[in-house]
Amino acid sequence: MKLWGGRFKEEESKLMEDFNSSLSFDKKLYYEDIKGSIAHVKMLTNQNIIKEEEKEKILLGLEEILKEIDEGILKIEGDYEDIHSFVEINLINKIGNVGKKLHTGRSRNDQVALDMKLYAKKSTEEVIECLKELMDSLIKVGNENNYIMPGYTHLQRAQVVTFRYHLLAYFEMFKRDEKRLENALEILNESPLGSGALAGSTYNIDKEYTAKLLGFRKPVDNFLDGVSDRDYIIELISKFSIIMMHLSRLSEELILWSSSEFRFIQIGDAYSTGSSIMPQKKNPDGAELIRGKIGRVYGDLISILTVMKSLPLAYNKDMQEDKEPFFDAKDTVISCLKVMEGIISTLKVNKENLMKSVKKGFLNATEAADYLVNKGMAFRDAHKVIGEVVIYCEDKNSAIEDLSLEELKQFSDLFCEDIYEFIDYKNSINKGIKKEMGYF
């Protein structure tokens, strides 16, 4: 049974039926589809479009279908065109002809637009919750490991920071991601139900009622836009892509830091794997997979952008292709956030190796230049002097703080005994605006 066919003389080919069907993936929307239908039926009764007793039968049937799906009694499978057909046909089979009144004053166009918006809202809230859990772990692990470490530019050791402060940089990234998603929720929070196929309905549909009942801020203002808007899907996948980019940056650093060349951290066994041939190997596969899965989400974004390119108003069947990219992007970003939270919450930090790397990289060179500036030298001249000091140290295989005062005075008479206190790593990180890094 189809929800259409009266104007056709010939049957749809089996090839076209299979090609046209979306049940295999839009079955994810069963909950939203049934909840939308419940709201629609209540509105139809309020507007005296269907009778009270008809409403009760339809509602009971819909609730039974929802319960049977949730309990695994009713399988979402079979020769149905989509989830809307599945629900409506099963409703008719369950309660009889009164079920045929469910779709009064509604099109699958505004129905699927509603389903996707409800699903997008729920999915976005899930992603926000995962972001919050990861941010909490970043703060907790950072506070537990507030150790001095090298900060990098160009992947070269640059200046002293702390492990805590480094993690807090990612906290800020994910905090922006959270704000972006909250803003997206506000924009998409308009109900398309009542838009019909593209031009509303001759029935006195109360779209404000259904919008409120379903938790939307308001109904859409334009019917054509209501059924054809997929901006929110593009926007959300775009924001998911930014989250994945942030996760990939963090993953890359964790992979580097856990390597034998760095040994800054140890990723827990629970988020590592081994080798089938090399017994000694402990691979950071969790972080590597997160880094790799960014390609999926970027691909999902390009997919939906391409689907929507040049589409005329209003609904077009191309829009059926909006679902799989969104479902995939949402599932991917949630799984990656959860795995990253697990990696962060269980990693171990090697305080000693962090400090060893600090001492090998002339990370107090900028502070040494600042010292000369405080003694009256212009910064550009101080920069040149300390550059020469670094060359001298490299030739001696020494650190700036290990040079004698006599050696330092070869480069400038401004050097005094207090230079050593000034360029001490623990002291320098608590000077000036550096205090904001919160080393304690």
Swiss-Prot record:
Q: In which pathway does it act?
A: Amino-acid biosynthesis; L-arginine biosynthesis; L-arginine from L-ornithine and carbamoyl phosphate: step 3/3
Query: What organism does the record attribute this protein to?
Result: Clostridium botulinum (strain Hall / ATCC 3502 / NCTC 13319 / Type A)
Gene from which the chain derives: argH
BP GO annotations = arginine biosynthetic process via ornithine; L-arginine biosynthetic process
**Which one Pfam family would you cite for this protein?**
ASL_C2
**Reaction(s) catalysed (UniProt annotation):** 2-(N(omega)-L-arginino)succinate = fumarate + L-arginine
- The record's EC number reads 4.3.2.1
Q: Which PROSITE patterns match?
A: FUMARATE_LYASES (PS00163)
**What protein name is recorded for this chain?**
Argininosuccinate lyase
